[in-house]
Amino acid sequence: MSRTNFDTLLEAGCHFGHLKRKWNPAMAPYIFMERNGIHIIDLHKTVAKVDEAAEALKQIAKSGKKVLFVATKKQAKQVVAEKAQSVNMPYVIERWPGGMLTNFPTIRKAVKKMATIDKLTSDGTYSNLSKREVLQISRQRAKLDKTLGSIADLTRLPSALFVIDVMKENIAVREANRLGIPVFGIVDTNSDPTNIDFVIPANDDATKSVEVILDACCAAMIEGLEERKAEKIDMEAAGEAPANKGKKKSAKARLDKSDEEAINAAKAAAFLKEDEEA
């Protein structure tokens, strides 16, 4: 049974492509006709491609891996954020950080900085700083959160990218291609589908079009997550789950309170120095 259908896609306006003069010839296999100078996408092919992508996404979710959703265009940002959150997946809806994938360790370092700042807030270190210093660090935290907050739980490279408008997000696509990360993409008639592993031919400018496609794909991912959870419960019931190993004792001696306060103060000073140099 299909994840979506012709009528649903038609009602959402998924069939509207771009002006003929803006088309990319590589999208010819997915174009049904031209009407009033505008290309019309073959929605029968869109249905098939949505099903293909949804099944692959389901298997990724079932395996416990992450899919990174990318959409920085205004029409898609909010809906992508909502759908990604519904399946507990990371997403980028602000500016794509250059090197997000190809220089992932640096991005992780910035994410960890947010966690460190949060710790300074909770452990009382802030009380030893001036209002100006607290404001500087808080601004750093807000700036980091805006661009990286939605990927805070991404501890390793994603197993796939789901991109809205592959032409606008060309840097993200290139980074994924370079690392061999599969790319799922909603591809309009003005875009090049060549480097997209799972092409979903559809209108990528209308919010409703993006929403109905994400609905189908995320529903499949939810199924995958539920199947993973059910299999885990069955394994535990059958006694096949690996025994919980005791936590390894840390080789480092525990820091006493004064040492920890000194380290946190040093971290706060480092953040302030970075802010002044920026």
Residue spans of the language-model regions?
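Ribosome large-subunit tunnel/peptidyl-transferase-proximal elements
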Residues: M1-I233
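Intrinsically disordered, compositionally biased charged tails
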Residues: M1-R3, E226-A278
